[in-house]
């Protein structure tokens, strides 16, 4: 399971060093793509294949489905971490998420999200403010 919060730096070549505890999970490859709220999603390759299979089931007659697929898949990039656990975040995704040097990487269970640290801090403050109110509706049985 991919969980936790980490604060790596983006190097001058646009590379992210994956947190050591996740490197084995990504050893066979990963897919980086546009994430919602302007972050970068990082899926283990096998997990992304499942996501893609679910997307294929969406009705082609739905404009919302077509739009979502286009935005997600047009920004997708296959990567294989190097021996030091580094992956290059392509310029199009760095621009999408407004990534600079300071990053926040969060585990969300089945994927990682890469955020600009300032953007993450603002997002988290807003999300945390409504956390107590949202739990029963968002995650049945947790409240």
Swiss-Prot record:
Predominant cellular place of this UniProt entry's protein: cytoplasm
SUPFAM superfamilies noted in UniProt: AbrB/MazE/MraZ-like (SSF89447)
Quaternary structure and interacting proteins, as annotated: Forms oligomers.
A biological process from GO: negative regulation of DNA-templated transcription initiation
Listed name of the protein: Transcriptional regulator MraZ
Pfam families documented for this protein: MraZ
Compartments where located: Cytoplasm, Nucleoid
Cysteine disulfide links: none
Organism of this sequence: Beutenbergia cavernae (strain ATCC BAA-8 / DSM 12333 / CCUG 43141 / JCM 11478 / NBRC 16432 / NCIMB 13614 / HKI 0122)
């Amino acid at each position: 399971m991919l969980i936790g919060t980490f604060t790596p730096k983006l190097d001058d070549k646009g590379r992210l060093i994956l947190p050591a505890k996740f490197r084995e999970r990504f050893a066979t490859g990963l897919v980086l793509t546009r994430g919602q709220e302007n972050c970068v999603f990082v899926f283990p390759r096998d997990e992304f294949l499942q996501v893609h299979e679910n997307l294929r089931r969406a009705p082609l007659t739905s404009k919302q489905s077509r739009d979502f697929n286009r935005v997600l898949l047009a920004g997708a990039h296959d990567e294989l971490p190097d021996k030091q656990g580094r992956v290059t975040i392509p310029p199009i995704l760095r621009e999408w998420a407004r990534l600079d040097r300071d990053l926040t990487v969060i585990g969300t269970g089945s994927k990682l999200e890469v955020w600009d640290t300032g953007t993450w801090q603002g997002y988290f403050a807003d999300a945390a403010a409504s956390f107590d109110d949202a739990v029963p509706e968002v995650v049945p049985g947790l409240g």
